[in-house]
């Protein structure tokens, strides 16, 4: 029986390590007083808050970037001057501009394409910012731009069901898989949408709590896991 399969990938902390980009940049400006994981979750929290305000039209995108940086540093007891904040943003962007797609991910995409699985990206964030990362990763080689679903463009953010339904309206399949690191957005959203979630934990480990969910620690585990789930 030939089922039509769609495999949807998150971007940040899935296709590259955003936590590493942040941590590398942070260490240029201060010595971390707390462990990397806690520091990153603080940054995530501050990023989400700033992005919410930007999405609601309360602040500009560049203000949201300044705010997430200054609040993260404040949380660890460091006051950054506005010059330092700008310097951090530039250093962060420079580090981000050097991200590459690992061979392992390329193999995943090649296998999916070989099996005629429809693959796509579903990511929360500002359109240009997310697109630049996808260009940097050279993603259009495997996933056409029409299948880059970015929350600002589709006007729906994971975990809202609208984001997942938007993908379904563009890609018809019998079974949808969501590959991502974030329990709140990727996993919860996928479960609500009746998709099959796979939590990707290589770069960012989040406790899935009582959610039943398959887990992949490395890209190479993803394809066999999809096969396994399909044959359950």
Please name every model-derived segment.
Residues 20, 24, 66-67, 161, ...:
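A structural signal for well-ordered alpha-helical segments within the folded catalytic domains
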Residues 87-88, 95-100, 105-138, 147-151:
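Substrate-recognition element of Asp-dependent hydrolases with the DxDx(T/V) motif
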Residues 23-27, 62-70, 127, 131:
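An amphipathic alpha-helix signature
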Residues 32-43, 75-88, 141-145:
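Short, surface-exposed acidic
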Residues 10-12, 17, 124, 181, ...:
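Acidic active-site catalytic centers that drive phospho-/nucleotidyl reactions
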Residues 1-45, 75:
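Active-site neighborhood of HAD-like aspartate-dependent phosphohydrolases
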Residues 49-90:
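A metal-dependent, Asp-based hydrolase signature
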Residues 1-5, 110, 126-232:
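Asp-based, Mg2+/Mn2+-dependent phosphohydrolase catalytic module
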């Amino acid at each position: 029986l030939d089922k039509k399969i769609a495999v949807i990938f998150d971007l940040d902390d899935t296709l590259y390590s955003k936590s590493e980009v942040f941590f590398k940049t942070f260490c240029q400006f201060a010595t971390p007083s707390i462990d990397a994981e806690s520091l990153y979750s603080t940054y995530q929290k501050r990023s989400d808050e700033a992005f919410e305000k930007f999405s609601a039209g309360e602040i500009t995108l560049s203000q949201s970037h300044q705010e997430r940086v200054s609040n993260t540093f404040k949380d660890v007891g460091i006051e950054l001057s506005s010059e330092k904040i700008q310097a951090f943003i530039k250093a962060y962007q420079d580090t981000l501009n050097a991200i590459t797609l690992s061979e392992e991910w390329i193999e995943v995409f090649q296998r999916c394409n070989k099996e005629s699985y429809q693959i796509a990206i579903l990511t929360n964030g500002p359109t240009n910012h997310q697109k630049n990362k996808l260009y940097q990763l050279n993603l259009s080689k495997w996933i056409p731009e029409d299948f880059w679903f970015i929350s600002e463009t589709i006007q729906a953010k994971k975990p809202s069901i609208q984001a997942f339904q938007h993908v379904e309206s563009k890609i018809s399949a019998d079974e949808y898989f969501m590959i991502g690191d974030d329990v709140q957005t990727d996993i919860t959203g996928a479960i609500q949408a009746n998709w099959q979630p796979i939590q990707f934990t290589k770069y960012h480990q989040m406790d899935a709590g009582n959610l039943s969910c398959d887990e992949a620690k490395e890209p190479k585990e993803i394809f066999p896991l999809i096969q396994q789930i399909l044959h359950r």
